[in-house]
């Protein structure tokens, strides 16, 4: 029986790796050698945080900026995307926070066509009023559209329901979804590394999905990261 389980697990892994590429998302400083380590470990992409809450207006996360620039300036053979974790209880609007992201990227010579917006309840206090949260997100989405930046949303079905109540949001029609499905932290809490468990919610359907986080809080190349999969082009 144990051998059969091992065979099935191995077969599923082979299927997953045939259709998907692996990535990590992180919110910690990285070095040149650690980025090389990710690439050597067959990770095809990094998702780096470029904005984080600070209890006031939110602030640019320079760790993510530096990681992106290290990859870009050294022509390292690994992809990189950016995400922002908005300060949902800050004094400024979603639009103003997106402006801070855009200005930081532009100032540092980063031409990111898409910014993923983290809409999760983990370590992020949202308003109890769904309408306030929707207004914040709509402000951010509209500003991105004005600046010509595509939007991705990082969330889950339960978080989206908790934060927006599945109310009408101005999620752009060309927005893509990065969803997470993890049982608990660490290797034993991983879900299947594929999109097979996705169920449509809110404005998102199967066609929206481009990335899935299937593992949370693991150590890779000496860093605390989350692990993801995305479809091969």
Where are these regions (language model features)?
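Cleavable N-terminal signal peptides of Sec/SRP-targeted secreted and luminal proteins
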Residues: 2-18
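Short, structurally constrained coil/turn elements
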Residues: 12, 76, 111, 147, ...
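Substrate-binding cleft of extracellular glycoside hydrolase catalytic domains
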Residues: 19-150
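Functionally critical loop-and-helix segments that line ligand-binding/catalytic clefts
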Residues: 19-28, 170-233
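Flexible, glycine-rich phosphate/dinucleotide-binding loops
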Residues: 55, 89, 160, 186, ...
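Conserved beta-strand termini and adjacent loop/short-helix elements that scaffold enzyme active sites
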Residues: 83-85, 154-156, 214
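Mature extracellular/periplasmic domains of secretome proteins
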Residues: 103-107, 165-170, 202
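Catalytic domains of cell-wall/extracellular-matrix polysaccharide-remodeling enzymes
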Residues: 113-194
